[in-house]
């Protein structure tokens, strides 16, 4: 049997809620089994409508659950949950502040590097309250980019000594 892991975004009593869910896949029967005990509600770092844990990254026996909003004005001390697939122990690992949303991530490569889709929709500006976009600052200084209302780009991350950089 293979393991399956998911994140679920939901509303609970008008507040956002995020869940980590795991189970196994029976390839012979073409079925996924997720026992009720394998549903963990994860406290949301900051309440923003329609923002929870959008991405999941597997490193060895750990599932890293990535919250969408990690900007400086929302989370001065950004972090992500890391959950042991073996015993479900939960810890926090540091994460860099990055403005806008992280919508999805690639799998880790052999150097513990991955890429995330870093996305801004103009309608999210009031909810995200973005600080200076350090990934764009060089372009803005040179006058290449002046007015940013939407962005869709790849951002590179690396797991190094138990932290995301």
Functional labels for PLM-detected ranges:
Residues 1-165:
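Sequence/structural signature of beta-propeller domains
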């Amino acid at each position: 049997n293979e393991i399956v892991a998911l994140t679920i975004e939901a509303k609970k009593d008008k507040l956002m809620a995020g869940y980590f869910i795991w189970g196994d896949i029976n390839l012979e029967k073409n079925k996924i089994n997720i026992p009720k005990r394998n549903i963990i509600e994860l406290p949301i770092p900051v309440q923003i409508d329609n923002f929870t844990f959008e991405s999941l990254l597997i490193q060895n026996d750990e599932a890293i659950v990535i919250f969408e909003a990690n900007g400086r004005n929302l989370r001065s001390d950004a972090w992500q949950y890391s959950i042991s697939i073996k015993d479900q122990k939960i810890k926090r690992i540091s994460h860099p502040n990055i403005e806008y949303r992280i919508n999805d991530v690639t799998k880790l490569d052999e150097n513990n590097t991955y890429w995330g889709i870093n996305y801004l929709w103009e309608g999210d500006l009031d909810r995200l309250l973005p600080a200076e976009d350090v990934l764009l600052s060089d372009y803005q200084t040179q006058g290449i980019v002046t007015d940013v209302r939407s962005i869709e780009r790849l951002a590179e991350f690396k797991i190094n000594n138990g932290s995301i950089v």
